[in-house]
């Protein structure tokens, strides 16, 4: 049993080498390959999709964030396996791990903005003129990236203690006293951002569903098809958020406390470490699921993808072009929830 235990990357308690040096790196490798391929393809497709609507601008930002996040996985794999120079682990602690979180939370916030965008287009259509303009969306995108970098970059700068020996590197040991405090504070901030976005999406999509169902119940046209489509789109987004992000954000706070506070037992630290590692893997797997959401969420994405793959895409509701403007808004929004 002693041969299968090694010190974990974070802390002095032993961990199972089968989990930390084989299972987790192998799963990250699978996610890395799938994420690069799927997001590379998504980026290629979106290159041909004009940024004609605000939600498309937000989706393109998510593609960029997911692709950049995928590029950090090889460094985590090498660090967990203990391959390469010890400087690789230092790079993971100082740079690639921070970039991972930056891109993860950028992606989360943009999905929140998409929900906000859809809510105002469907439920509050009279207020959409400025909020849904392309220039506003691009400005908001710059603000999201800037604020996320502002919160996260100090974690790079304050991970500044020197490593003089090629020993097992522990990320928390590289942080200054201020770095430890900022690590804890930024973790709380990002967890708070996630829960705000998650609860907002529940509110937005509940209101959207009620509005769509009520509008089509009154018109009594294609109500079954609309219900199925809107339910599918809403379910796909909330499913990804719940499966990929909720477990990690439940585990994040107690794990951060176990890193920065001394009263946790070795066994507690070990359990929280495993929970954090596997829940973080679920969050990383989000880069493989987002392209599926693009397909359901964005009709221009579907059209370009099918055109590039020479697949015949069925046209739907061709006869609906004569509907009144209100019905057109509801139908379009059903395709792009």
Curated annotation (Swiss-Prot):
Predominant location of this chain?
Answer: membrane
Location of this chain's protein in the cell: Cell membrane
GO molecular function terms attached to this record = G protein-coupled purinergic nucleotide receptor activity
Q: How does it sit in the membrane?
A: Multi-pass membrane protein
> Does this UniProt record's set of keywords contain Cell wall biogenesis/degradation?
no
Membrane-spanning ranges = 29-49, 55-75, 96-116, 139-159, 188-208, 234-254, 278-298
Q: Give the GO cellular component terms, alphabetically.
A: plasma membrane
Superkingdom of the source species: Eukaryota
Query: Cytoplasmic compartment: which residues?
Result: 50-54, 117-138, 209-233, 299-337
Cite the ranges annotated as topological domain Extracellular. Answer: 1-28, 76-95, 160-187, 255-277
Which cysteines are cross-linked by disulfides? 93-171
Which residues does the record list as glycosylated?
2, 162
UniProt KW keywords: Cell membrane, Disulfide bond, G-protein coupled receptor, Glycoprotein, Membrane, Receptor, Transducer, Transmembrane, Transmembrane helix
InterPro entries linked: GPCR_Rhodpsn (IPR000276), GPCR_Rhodpsn_7TM (IPR017452), P2Y14_rcpt (IPR005466)
GO terms, biological process: G protein-coupled receptor signaling pathway
Its family remark reads: Belongs to the G-protein coupled receptor 1 family.
**What is the purpose of this protein?**
Receptor for UDP-glucose and other UDP-sugar coupled to G-proteins. Not activated by ATP, ADP, UTP or ATP.
This one is known as P2Y purinoceptor 14
This chain's source organism reads Bos taurus (Bovine)
């Amino acid at each position: 049993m002693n041969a299968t235990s090694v010190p974990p990357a974070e802390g002095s308690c032993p961990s199972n080498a089968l989990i930390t040096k084989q299972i987790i790196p192998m799963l990250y490798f699978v996610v890395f390959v799938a994420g690069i391929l799927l997001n590379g393809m998504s980026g290629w497709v979106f290159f041909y999709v004009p940024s004609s609507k605000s939600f498309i601008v937000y989706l393109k930002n998510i593609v960029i964030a997911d692709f950049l996040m995928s590029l950090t996985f090889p460094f985590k794999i090498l660090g967990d396996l203990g391959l390469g120079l010890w400087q690789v682990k230092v790079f993971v602690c100082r740079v690639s791990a921070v970039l991972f979180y930056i891109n993860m939370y950028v992606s989360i916030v943009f999905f929140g903005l998409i929900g906000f965008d859809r809510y105002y287009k469907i439920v509050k259509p009279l207020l959409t003129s400025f909020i849904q303009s392309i220039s506003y969306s691009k400005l908001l995108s710059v603000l999201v990236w800037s604020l996320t970098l502002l919160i996260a970059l100090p974690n790079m700068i304050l991970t500044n203690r020197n490593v003089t020996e090629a020993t097992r590197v522990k990320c928390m040991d590289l942080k200054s006293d201020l770095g430890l405090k900022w690590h804890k504070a930024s973790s709380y901030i990002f967890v708070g951002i996630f829960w705000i976005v998650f609860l907002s999406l529940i509110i937005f999509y509940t209101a959207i569903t009620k509005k769509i169902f009520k509008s089509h119940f009154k018109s009594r046209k294609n109500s079954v098809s609309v219900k199925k489509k809107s339910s599918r789109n809403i379910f796909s987004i909330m499913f990804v958020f719940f499966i990929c992000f909720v477990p990690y954000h439940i585990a994040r706070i107690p794990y951060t406390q176990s890193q920065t506070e001394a009263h946790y037992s070795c066994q507690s630290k070990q359990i929280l470490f495993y929970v954090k590692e596997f829940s973080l893997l679920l969050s990383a797997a989000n880069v493989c699921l987002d392209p599926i959401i693009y397909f359901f969420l964005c009709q221009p994405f579907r059209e370009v993808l099918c055109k590039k793959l020479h697949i015949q895409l069925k046209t739907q509701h061709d006869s609906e072009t004569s509907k009144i403007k209100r019905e057109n808004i509801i139908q379009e929004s059903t395709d792009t929830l």
